[in-house]
Amino acid sequence: MVYPESFYNSISWTWYYADTATPTYNCLGFATGSRTWEWPSSFGSSSATKAQVDSYLSTLGYRPSTYDPFILAYGENVNSITHFSKVTGLEWCRAKWGQLELFNHGSHDPYYHSSYGALQIKYTAN
């Protein structure tokens, strides 16, 4: 791992190493399956609004829904989305942390609010 465990513990209360660090893709690129560095220019440099995320993900076949989520969006609030993960089970998700590693999480809401933020929006396939 790139950093000591204490670094990762400060971001999430439940994380399990899944794959090595790489700058070739990020959280959104992993969640959508593109495995590229995916951050539309309409999102701005660090966060996106719910309307921006809804619009972008709709072009990929996703819509907001509380049921059967495929992609989870995190942030300070619904109009400050900064991170995404891919649902892998009823309570599990997997996320790429920027240029850092890929991690499994034992919760759909695994982050401390001071880092990636809380779960804000769930997206399902159309």
Residue ranges and their predicted role:
Residues M1-L60:
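N-terminal capping segments
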Residues Y3, Y8, Y16-Y17, Y25, ...:
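Sequence-level detector for tyrosine residue identity
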Residues N9, N26, N77-N79, N104, ...:
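Detector for Asparagine
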Residues G29-F30, I71, W92, I121:
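Generic structural signal for residues positioned in beta-strands
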Residues S45-E101:
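...with weaker cross-activation on analogous glycine-rich loops/strands in unrelated enzymes
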Residues T88-N126:
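Aromatic- and glycine-rich peptidoglycan recognition patches
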